[in-house]
Amino acid sequence: MKKLKIVMTGGGSAGHVTPNLALVPKLKELGYEIEYIGTKDGIERSIIEKENIKYNCISSGKLRRYIDIKNFSDPFKVILGIFQSVSILRKKKPNIVFSKGGFVSVPVVIAAHFCRIPVIAHESDITPGLANRIAVPYCTKVCATFPESLNNIKGNKGILTGTPIRDELFKGSKIKGLEICGFTGEKPVLMIIGGSLGSKIINDTVREALNKLIKKYDIVHICGKGNIDEALSKLKGYKQFDYISTELPHVMNAADLVISRAGANAIFELLALKKPNLLIPLSKKSSRGDQILNAMSFEKNGYSMVVQEDDLTPTLLVEKVIKLESDKEKYKKAMNSSPVKNGVENIIKVIDKYKKCKI
């Protein structure tokens, strides 16, 4: 038998990349050789290459829901990306392709279909993103995180697996996390995560509320690339990062409370780590509303407190954080009783079942 090979894809934001990494150790254990296809300048490249995974670059256009002159040129980039992906896949001859979505995945999935290579996609949110909606007809199966998602995946292709969570997240050290942030551990640690690309409204609101929050909490703020406020860099008890990767398990372990966007990967990691959290989902003005649905599901199950972006003010933020701390045991109890499991094993089973065998 030839060595098993899998090509992975997904990008545009960390949420379309890091879940792939959760699968890597188990895939290697099963004997898979792993390669990745992404864009030259995408966030996926820096994340994947740090893991010493072979990276292949293609062209791809962004999928926009708004009017932009690039909407006329980007389809040609996608077409170029399809031809580039076909060339790569014919050369690499993988047994299967795994897609985590994002605009870079579209040409890869279409190319795999043309090359008659099985494709397994994963959808994190309740409703499929635009890239996955385009890709579903070319997929063999689509792994879903939420039970509600199955109704939104056409062709009876959906399989409920849960979301893959990186094993290293469970191996963080609180002491190391405090050291990384320069905190003493005397105050509760409040962690703010605005997504890998950052959130201006969350960043601005947190900083406007700093004078009140910092009296009660040590604050670690992951604010997105280019969003560090140098004027606040020496403020005691307030540590800023544009993005963290290897340090994340330690910093998350040190966190007592978390403010986060409501992307599915992020919230399921918070659930797995049993972190009391305040979710601020992207508004419908700047998204398809998927984060609002995710947040509503978690709020309904008692895992999260939710504030809508349109309602967010510094005063309300402070009130909600204080309330979250006072009710933290209630949220931990709900999370501890959750039936949701790490999706790694389930997804690996799907990949192994549908891989193309070669003699």
Curated annotation (Swiss-Prot):
Gene Ontology, cellular component aspect: plasma membrane
Task: Give the UniProt keywords, A-Z.
Answer: Cell cycle, Cell division, Cell membrane, Cell shape, Cell wall biogenesis/degradation, Glycosyltransferase, Membrane, Peptidoglycan synthesis, Transferase
Keyword presence, Metal-binding = no
Q: In which pathway does it act?
A: Cell wall biogenesis; peptidoglycan biosynthesis
Summarize where UDP-N-acetyl-alpha-D-glucosamine binds, as residue positions: S13, A14, G15, R166, S196, Q291
Q: Taking the first listed entry, what is the main subcellular location of this protein, grouped into a coarse class?
A: membrane
Judged by the first EC level, this protein's enzyme class is transferase
SUPFAM superfamilies linked: UDP-Glycosyltransferase/glycogen phosphorylase (SSF53756)
Q: Which Enzyme Commission number(s) are on file for it?
A: 2.4.1.227
User: Which GO molecular function annotation, any one, does this entry have?
Assistant: UDP-N-acetyl-D-glucosamine:N-acetylmuramoyl-L-alanyl-D-glutamyl-meso-2,6-diaminopimelyl-D-alanyl-D-alanine-diphosphoundecaprenol 4-beta-N-acetylglucosaminlytransferase activity
List GO BP terms, alphabetically. carbohydrate metabolic process; cell division; cell wall organization; lipid glycosylation; peptidoglycan biosynthetic process; regulation of cell shape
Highest rank taxon of the organism: Bacteria
Among Pfam families, the record links this protein to: Glyco_tran_28_C, Glyco_transf_28
Does the UniProt entry include the keyword Nucleotide-binding?
A: no
Where's it found, cell-wise? Cell membrane
Reaction(s) this enzyme catalyzes, per UniProt: di-trans,octa-cis-undecaprenyl diphospho-N-acetyl-alpha-D-muramoyl-L-alanyl-D-glutamyl-meso-2,6-diaminopimeloyl-D-alanyl-D-alanine + UDP-N-acetyl-alpha-D-glucosamine = di-trans,octa-cis-undecaprenyl diphospho-[N-acetyl-alpha-D-glucosaminyl-(1->4)]-N-acetyl-alpha-D-muramoyl-L-alanyl-D-glutamyl-meso-2,6-diaminopimeloyl-D-alanyl-D-alanine + UDP + H(+)
Which InterPro entries does this one have? GlcNAc_MurG (IPR006009), Glyco_trans_28_C (IPR007235), GlycoTrans_28_N (IPR004276)
Tell me the membrane topology, using the record's own terms: Peripheral membrane protein
| Role noted for this protein | Cell wall formation. Catalyzes the transfer of a GlcNAc subunit on undecaprenyl-pyrophosphoryl-MurNAc-pentapeptide (lipid intermediate I) to form undecaprenyl-pyrophosphoryl-MurNAc-(pentapeptide)GlcNAc (lipid intermediate II).
Family, similarity comment = Belongs to the glycosyltransferase 28 family. MurG subfamily.
User: What is the protein's name according to its record?
Assistant: UDP-N-acetylglucosamine--N-acetylmuramyl-(pentapeptide) pyrophosphoryl-undecaprenol N-acetylglucosamine transferase
Q: Which organism is it from?
A: Clostridium acetobutylicum (strain ATCC 824 / DSM 792 / JCM 1419 / IAM 19013 / LMG 5710 / NBRC 13948 / NRRL B-527 / VKM B-1787 / 2291 / W)
